[in-house]
Amino acid sequence: MAKFKIKDGVAIIPEKTTEIGTEAFKNSRTLVEATIPSAVTTIEASAFEGCKKLKSITIVGAVTKIGANAFAGCEMLESIVMPDSITEIEENAFNGCCKLTSITLPASLTKIGAAAFADCNKIEEVTIPASVTEIGAKAFAITGWNSRLTKVVLPDGLTTIGDEAFDSCRNLAEIAIPATVTSIGESAFSGCSSLTSVTIPNSVTSIGFYAFYYCTSLTSVTIP
């Protein structure tokens, strides 16, 4: 596995690098900024996990996968630029990035893994790209009641909303469930206490236990 250097808080990654390996920068105490060069195709598991001073990541070019826990616990991460080459964001990839205020998910993305953006409590809006068919369990779930998420746009083509996908997003006021969704997982919208109305499309064949539990403002539910 390649070893990388950090100079003045910036990751030094050679242009010919093709992979940021498992735990490459894990728990670095000095890393503040990183640019992933265009030859890199994969950011492996825990590559930047626990880099508590990391503020900015720019991913250039050909990366297709962001591995499990890749940026988990990067508490100071404020921004990330992702290219349209990314198809998969694996579980816990950005879990606990509590300073991340906005994300632009690439149009190439097909899967958002379990807890990928869990406890990213400062994100206010999310638009899920049309290519995504599955939102993993706890993908945007919040521990506690401090979520700022107010708007989520779900695409036509989405089939699965995982267990606890938006659990405790207390400021989420509305959600439009596309007519392609077949499964709404257990506690998928539990604790979304600002949600006022929900329309379940004809395509849905399964609604899990507690899917809308503690949605205390919910006054209208339309079920086919």
Task: Describe each region flagged by the PLM.
Residues 2-19, 29-42, 52-65, 75-88, ...:
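Structural signature of tandem-repeat unit edges
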Residues 140-144:
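Short regulatory "switch" loops immediately downstream of catalytic or recognition motifs
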